[in-house]
UniProtKB/Swiss-Prot annotation:
Pfam families listed in its UniProt record: HHH_5, RuvA_C, RuvA_N
Protein name per UniProt: Holliday junction branch migration complex subunit RuvA
Region span, Domain I: 1-64
Gene responsible for this protein: ruvA
Organism: Delftia acidovorans (strain DSM 14801 / SPH-1)
Molecular function (Gene Ontology), one example: ATP binding
Length: 190
């Protein structure tokens, strides 16, 4: 219903901010990653929002980027993950880190987030696989096009994205595509 707010930032009390839009003050919950990038009070601010209506409350959640809002929306679709927990996840790690954790299926990174236990982390990884890591993490996980080409080649050969990314970690950072594929195949053969 409310997709974006643009106005004057009146107050900053983590994780909540107050934004004045044409004389109406909106209380908006934001992840810490967005909070740290906000301007000083009194400055103009623009936030992408997600509006949640519950029986006892109507809440606005704000985000600095489209990828943050999309990650939030994917997180709240998961059983047992509400808006507060999703905000906690996005406050505990960047969208890129979350996408990388999903791509590499790293439970350990998610359990570091307050309120996320091992079972919840495993459920998150299972349900987010293919939704968040595919478009967000693939871009941030690979530093350059050569690395991306190496991973794509390995996946075309039938290796999973997790195996391909693990093999990529073992390669020198400046390796070319041809040599990188050869070295990655040797690493995967072991």
């Amino acid at each position: 219903m409310i997709g974006k707010l643009t106005g004057t930032l009146l107050e900053k009390n983590p994780p909540e901010v107050l934004v004045d839009c044409g004389g109406v003050g909106y209380e908006v919950q934001v992840p810490m990653s967005t909070f740290y990038n906000l301007p000083a009070s009194g400055a103009k601010v623009s936030l992408l929002t997600h509006f949640v209506v519950r029986e006892d409350a109507q809440l606005l959640y704000g985000f600095g980027t489209h990828s943050e809002r999309q990650a939030f929306r994917e997180l709240i679709k998961i059983t047992g993950i509400g808006p507060r927990m999703a905000l906690s996840v996005l406050s505990g790690m960047s969208v890129e880190d979350l996408a990388q954790a999903v791509t590499l299926q790293e439970v350990g990174r998610l359990v570091k987030v307050p309120g996320i236990g091992k079972k919840t982390a495993e459920r998150l990884l299972l349900e987010l696989k293919g939704k968040i890591g595919a478009d967000t993490g693939a871009q941030s996980l690979f530093v350059n096009n050569d690395q991306n080409d190496i991973v794509q080649a390995l996946m075309a050969l039938g290796y999973s994205d997790k195996d391909a990314a693990a093999a990529l970690k073992k390669l020198p950072p400046d390796v070319g595509v041809t040599e990188g594929i050869k070295l990655a195949l040797k690493a995967l053969a072991k």
